[in-house]
Amino acid sequence: MCIRDRSWQGTALVVDISGDISANVGMPNKIIFDPTAKDCVPYDVFASIDAAPDESERQERLEQLAYLLLPDKANDSEAGIFFAKNGRKMITAALICYYGMGWGFVEICEYFLGHDWRSLLNDIAQQKNKIANMYISSFVGASEQNTAGCKQAADDALKLFATNDKIKNALRKTASYEPSISPATLETNSIYIYIPDEKLKIYGDLLRIITAQSMEYFSSRPKEHTQMILFCLDEFASFGKLQITEALRKLRKRHIRIMVLTQSLADLDMIYGKDERKAMLGNFKFTVLLGCKDTETQEYFSKMIGD
């Protein structure tokens, strides 16, 4: 990988499955984010929200976080789309309400899962946060069965962050004098996210949050920041749906280089659909093919190369 080359002068955000990459890279200012370790330097989910210049921008970023937590799924059923859309409204209302009260991310997730939909919505309403209440006003008089389905969709999206002790430790709220990491850390340090191979499915939601927030940071990165940042995503299909195609089109101007590693096109098709996968591959300057077994993938790359 190019990050082993001493000529590389920038930093890197690397998803390092099983720790094979970080063990072989001697970059200075390297931070290993290991959510399985007790002494893990925590990742600050709310860093970009804290840095928002005004209340309106803060609200938008909280709404975007809700979308990252409960994204749309390709080829989802009509019922699935409904539950996800309205489950996001519940999450957004909770984030806006309880963030405004000074709660941490893990604390909000724990409270959300610890209450049924009626208790949760009543408590949010009682806080009299005008914006938060706008997101839940549509549930007044709605079918209780549908509302329960929306809450269940939201619960499933937040469960990892509310019930897994290792993840809760890795995302814990810190005092102002304690160290933590966020996408802005990449301006001075490289971050290697170590995920054991056997934990990849379990921690997939965590990876999606970190990588998606990093892309958001990159998209608004000040133009005077010219140091290169390598964005390396191993086992890419494990992240769920990211706005990667748009990032490939725009982030080069922000001095970001993206490297995506995946085992098959079929994995990408399941998440993004064929059309977006084709658009994605069309925006990579270089494609390295190490091997493929299924006929469709062989035909695709054969035509790309020119038979």
Question: Where are each of the predicted segments found?
Answer:
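P-loop NTPase motor domains
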Residues: 3-257, 272-274, 293
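Conserved ATP-driven motor cores of ASCE-family P-loop NTPases powering translocation/secretion/packaging/pilus
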Residues: 248-250, 254-307
